[in-house]
Regions:
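Short aromatic-glycine-enriched beta-strand elements
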Residues: 13-18
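Beta-strand/loop nucleic-acid-binding surfaces
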Residues: 25-36
């Protein structure tokens, strides 16, 4: 399980980006990968899964 902060999330389009705490890597997140609703600056936990364009955040939930 990874930890990070929501840097951007567009409710209308259903996607955003999470910045991982330990590495400062940013990962794409789609609304289908959410456990709970998220907002910008929320601290979250998430798993990583290979997607079409690299690693995506999945199982995202507020910490």
């Amino acid at each position: 399980m990874n930890n990070g902060t929501v840097k951007f999330f567009n409710d209308v389009k259903g996607f955003g980006f999470i910045k991982e705490t330990n590495s400062d890597q940013e990962y794409f997140v789609h609304v289908s990968g959410l456990v709970h609703e998220i907002r910008e600056n929320d601290v979250v936990t998430f798993d990583l899964q290979e997607g079409k364009k690299g690693l995506n955040a999945v199982n995202v939930q507020r910490a």
